Protein backbone atom coordinates (compact mmCIF):
# COMPACT_ATOMS: atom_id res chain seq x y z
CA UNK A 1 0.00 0.00 0.00
CA UNK A 2 1.35 3.40 -1.03
CA UNK A 3 0.05 6.30 1.06
CA UNK A 4 -0.20 9.95 0.04
CA UNK A 5 -1.47 13.03 1.87
CA UNK A 6 -2.81 16.04 -0.04
CA UNK A 7 -3.90 19.07 1.94
CA UNK A 8 -6.39 20.43 -0.60
CA UNK A 9 -8.09 19.16 -3.78
CA UNK A 10 -6.05 21.69 -5.77
CA UNK A 11 -2.79 19.99 -4.73
CA UNK A 12 -3.68 16.55 -6.12
CA UNK A 13 -2.15 15.31 -9.40
CA UNK A 14 -4.40 16.45 -12.23
CA UNK A 15 -3.93 13.33 -14.35
CA UNK A 16 -4.26 10.61 -11.73
CA UNK A 17 -6.66 9.05 -9.23
CA UNK A 18 -5.96 6.58 -6.40
CA UNK A 19 -7.42 3.13 -5.87
CA UNK A 20 -8.94 4.55 -2.68
CA UNK A 21 -9.60 8.19 -1.88
CA UNK A 22 -10.15 9.07 1.78
CA UNK A 23 -11.77 12.50 1.93
CA UNK A 24 -11.31 14.48 5.16
CA UNK A 25 -13.14 17.61 6.32
CA UNK A 26 -13.07 17.39 10.11
CA UNK A 27 -14.68 20.83 10.58
CA UNK A 28 -17.22 19.76 9.60
CA UNK A 29 -18.51 18.08 6.43
CA UNK A 30 -17.14 14.54 6.80
CA UNK A 31 -17.88 14.55 10.53
CA UNK A 32 -21.46 15.51 9.67
CA UNK A 33 -21.73 12.89 6.91
CA UNK A 34 -20.52 10.12 9.24
CA UNK A 35 -22.87 11.28 12.00
CA UNK A 36 -25.89 11.47 9.69
CA UNK A 37 -25.35 7.96 8.30
CA UNK A 38 -24.77 6.60 11.79
CA UNK A 39 -28.08 8.17 12.85
CA UNK A 40 -29.97 6.38 10.09
CA UNK A 41 -29.92 8.70 7.08
CA UNK A 42 -30.68 6.77 3.87
CA UNK A 43 -27.74 8.43 2.09
CA UNK A 44 -25.83 11.68 1.86
CA UNK A 45 -25.60 13.36 -1.54
CA UNK A 46 -22.93 16.03 -1.87
CA UNK A 47 -22.93 19.06 -4.16
CA UNK A 48 -20.38 21.81 -4.69
CA UNK A 49 -23.17 24.07 -5.99
CA UNK A 50 -26.14 25.16 -3.89
CA UNK A 51 -28.17 25.70 -7.04
CA UNK A 52 -27.62 22.09 -8.12
CA UNK A 53 -28.48 20.87 -4.61
CA UNK A 54 -31.82 22.70 -4.75
CA UNK A 55 -32.60 21.44 -8.24
CA UNK A 56 -31.87 17.77 -7.54
CA UNK A 57 -33.44 17.69 -4.07
CA UNK A 58 -36.64 19.22 -5.47
CA UNK A 59 -37.30 15.88 -7.24
CA UNK A 60 -37.60 14.16 -3.84
CA UNK A 61 -40.64 14.14 -1.60
CA UNK A 62 -40.26 16.78 1.15
CA UNK A 63 -40.66 14.16 3.89
CA UNK A 64 -37.80 12.10 2.41
CA UNK A 65 -35.22 14.86 2.04
CA UNK A 66 -33.17 17.26 4.13
CA UNK A 67 -31.18 20.13 2.68
CA UNK A 68 -27.97 21.03 4.49
CA UNK A 69 -26.12 24.10 3.29
CA UNK A 70 -23.15 26.00 4.70
CA UNK A 71 -21.08 28.89 3.43
CA UNK A 72 -18.35 30.54 5.49
CA UNK A 73 -19.27 28.35 8.46
CA UNK A 74 -22.83 29.66 8.63
CA UNK A 75 -26.11 27.95 7.68
CA UNK A 76 -27.60 28.81 4.29
CA UNK A 77 -31.04 30.27 5.04
CA UNK A 78 -32.86 28.31 2.30
CA UNK A 79 -31.75 24.99 3.81
CA UNK A 80 -33.17 22.89 6.65
CA UNK A 81 -29.79 22.41 8.31
CA UNK A 82 -26.34 23.94 8.32
CA UNK A 83 -23.19 21.84 8.64
CA UNK A 84 -23.38 20.92 12.32
CA UNK A 85 -23.08 17.20 13.08
CA UNK A 86 -25.02 17.82 16.29
CA UNK A 87 -28.15 18.51 14.22
CA UNK A 88 -28.02 15.02 12.71
CA UNK A 89 -29.99 13.12 15.34
CA UNK A 90 -32.04 10.00 14.50
CA UNK A 91 -35.23 12.01 15.03
CA UNK A 92 -34.16 14.46 12.33
CA UNK A 93 -32.39 12.32 9.71
CA UNK A 94 -33.60 8.71 9.99
CA UNK A 95 -34.80 7.34 6.65
CA UNK A 96 -34.09 10.58 4.80
CA UNK A 97 -31.55 11.59 2.20
CA UNK A 98 -29.31 14.47 3.25
CA UNK A 99 -28.49 16.80 0.35
CA UNK A 100 -25.41 18.74 1.44
CA UNK A 101 -23.25 21.54 0.10
CA UNK A 102 -20.42 23.06 2.12
CA UNK A 103 -17.62 25.55 1.56
CA UNK A 104 -14.84 22.97 1.32
CA UNK A 105 -15.69 19.31 1.90
CA UNK A 106 -18.03 18.79 -1.01
CA UNK A 107 -15.41 20.14 -3.44
CA UNK A 108 -12.94 17.54 -2.19
CA UNK A 109 -15.48 14.75 -2.68
CA UNK A 110 -16.13 15.98 -6.21
CA UNK A 111 -12.40 15.99 -7.08
CA UNK A 112 -12.05 12.22 -6.43
CA UNK A 113 -15.59 11.01 -7.19
CA UNK A 114 -14.37 8.88 -10.10
CA UNK A 115 -11.87 6.94 -7.98
CA UNK A 116 -12.49 3.21 -7.63
CA UNK A 117 -13.26 3.64 -3.91
CA UNK A 118 -14.21 6.88 -2.12
CA UNK A 119 -14.75 7.00 1.64
CA UNK A 120 -15.33 9.87 4.06
CA UNK A 121 -13.13 10.11 7.15
CA UNK A 122 -13.04 12.22 10.28
CA UNK A 123 -11.49 11.75 13.69
CA UNK A 124 -14.76 10.32 15.04
CA UNK A 125 -14.62 7.31 12.65
CA UNK A 126 -10.83 7.01 12.26
CA UNK A 127 -10.65 3.39 13.53
CA UNK A 128 -13.39 2.22 11.15
CA UNK A 129 -11.63 3.87 8.20
CA UNK A 130 -8.36 2.16 9.09
CA UNK A 131 -10.10 -1.19 9.55
CA UNK A 132 -11.49 -0.88 6.03
CA UNK A 133 -8.07 -0.06 4.56
CA UNK A 134 -6.53 -3.02 6.39
CA UNK A 135 -9.27 -5.30 5.06
CA UNK A 136 -9.33 -4.12 1.44
CA UNK A 137 -5.62 -3.25 1.09
CA UNK A 138 -5.89 -0.83 -1.87
CA UNK A 139 -2.61 -0.30 -3.72
CA UNK A 140 -2.68 3.50 -3.62
CA UNK A 141 -4.45 5.60 -0.98
CA UNK A 142 -4.90 9.35 -0.96
CA UNK A 143 -5.72 11.02 2.33
CA UNK A 144 -7.28 14.17 0.90
CA UNK A 145 -7.89 17.15 3.13
CA UNK A 146 -10.51 19.69 2.15
CA UNK A 147 -8.64 22.72 3.46
CA UNK A 148 -10.26 26.14 3.59
CA UNK A 149 -10.92 27.89 0.28
CA UNK A 150 -7.87 26.28 -1.31
CA UNK A 151 -5.55 26.72 1.68
CA UNK A 152 -4.03 24.42 4.31
CA UNK A 153 -6.20 23.25 7.19
CA UNK A 154 -4.63 22.18 10.48
CA UNK A 155 -7.50 19.90 11.55
CA UNK A 156 -7.60 17.98 8.26
CA UNK A 157 -3.83 17.48 8.36
CA UNK A 158 -3.95 16.14 11.91
CA UNK A 159 -6.74 13.73 10.95
CA UNK A 160 -4.67 12.47 8.01
CA UNK A 161 -1.81 11.96 10.46
CA UNK A 162 -4.11 10.10 12.87
CA UNK A 163 -5.19 7.71 10.10
CA UNK A 164 -1.62 7.19 8.89
CA UNK A 165 -0.36 6.60 12.45
CA UNK A 166 -2.91 3.87 13.18
CA UNK A 167 -2.39 2.29 9.77
CA UNK A 168 1.37 2.11 10.27
CA UNK A 169 0.86 0.49 13.68
CA UNK A 170 -1.10 -2.39 12.15
CA UNK A 171 0.39 -2.87 8.68
CA UNK A 172 3.99 -3.53 7.75
CA UNK A 173 5.39 -2.37 4.45
CA UNK A 174 3.28 0.76 3.96
CA UNK A 175 5.12 2.92 1.43
CA UNK A 176 5.19 6.64 2.20
CA UNK A 177 4.23 8.38 -1.04
CA UNK A 178 5.09 12.00 -0.24
CA UNK A 179 6.59 14.25 2.43
CA UNK A 180 3.14 15.40 3.50
CA UNK A 181 2.57 12.00 5.13
CA UNK A 182 5.62 12.50 7.37
CA UNK A 183 4.51 16.02 8.28
CA UNK A 184 0.96 14.87 9.09
CA UNK A 185 2.30 12.07 11.29
CA UNK A 186 4.52 14.51 13.19
CA UNK A 187 1.61 16.91 13.66
CA UNK A 188 -0.68 14.20 15.03
CA UNK A 189 1.95 12.75 17.34
CA UNK A 190 2.56 16.21 18.82
CA UNK A 191 -1.12 16.99 19.42
CA UNK A 192 -2.82 13.60 19.82
CA UNK A 193 -3.56 14.07 23.52
CA UNK A 194 -4.85 17.63 23.10
CA UNK A 195 -6.75 17.82 19.82
CA UNK A 196 -9.44 20.16 21.12
CA UNK A 197 -6.84 22.75 22.09
CA UNK A 198 -5.40 22.50 18.58
CA UNK A 199 -8.86 23.09 17.13
CA UNK A 200 -9.27 26.19 19.29
CA UNK A 201 -5.99 27.51 17.86
CA UNK A 202 -6.74 26.69 14.22
CA UNK A 203 -8.06 29.38 11.89
CA UNK A 204 -11.27 27.49 11.09
CA UNK A 205 -11.72 26.62 14.74
CA UNK A 206 -11.51 30.34 15.51
CA UNK A 207 -14.04 31.00 12.77
CA UNK A 208 -16.48 28.48 14.25
CA UNK A 209 -15.96 29.82 17.78
CA UNK A 210 -17.01 33.19 16.41
CA UNK A 211 -20.25 31.51 15.27
CA UNK A 212 -20.77 30.01 18.77
CA UNK A 213 -20.01 26.46 17.60
CA UNK A 214 -18.12 25.44 20.76
CA UNK A 215 -19.96 22.12 21.07
CA UNK A 216 -19.25 21.27 17.44
CA UNK A 217 -15.51 21.65 18.08
CA UNK A 218 -15.71 19.37 21.11
CA UNK A 219 -17.62 16.74 19.16
CA UNK A 220 -15.38 16.89 16.08
CA UNK A 221 -12.19 16.54 18.16
CA UNK A 222 -13.18 13.12 19.52
CA UNK A 223 -11.35 10.09 18.13
CA UNK A 224 -12.79 6.64 17.33
CA UNK A 225 -16.30 7.17 18.75
CA UNK A 226 -18.40 6.04 15.75
CA UNK A 227 -18.27 2.69 13.96
CA UNK A 228 -19.53 3.98 10.63
CA UNK A 229 -17.92 4.10 7.20
CA UNK A 230 -19.44 6.45 4.61
CA UNK A 231 -18.64 4.98 1.19
CA UNK A 232 -19.55 6.26 -2.25
CA UNK A 233 -22.04 4.07 -4.13
CA UNK A 234 -22.28 6.41 -7.12
CA UNK A 235 -20.61 9.77 -7.84
CA UNK A 236 -21.52 12.17 -5.06
CA UNK A 237 -23.72 9.73 -3.12
CA UNK A 238 -22.42 8.18 0.10
CA UNK A 239 -24.08 5.39 2.06
CA UNK A 240 -23.25 3.44 5.21
CA UNK A 241 -20.91 0.56 4.34
From Swiss-Prot:
Family of this protein: Belongs to the ComB family.
EC supergroup of this enzyme: hydrolase
Protein name per its UniProtKB record: Probable 2-phosphosulfolactate phosphatase
Keyword Hydrolase among UniProt keywords: yes
GO molecular function, one term: magnesium ion binding
Record-linked SUPFAM superfamilies: ComB-like (SSF142823)
Record key words, sorted: Hydrolase, Magnesium
Cofactor(s) needed for function: Mg(2+)
Coiled-coil intervals, chain numbering: none
Enzyme Commission code(s) on record: 3.1.3.71
Organism: Gloeothece citriformis (strain PCC 7424) (Cyanothece sp. (strain PCC 7424))
Presence of the UniProt keyword Cell membrane in the record: no
Catalysed reactions listed for this entry: (2R)-O-phospho-3-sulfolactate + H2O = (2R)-3-sulfolactate + phosphate
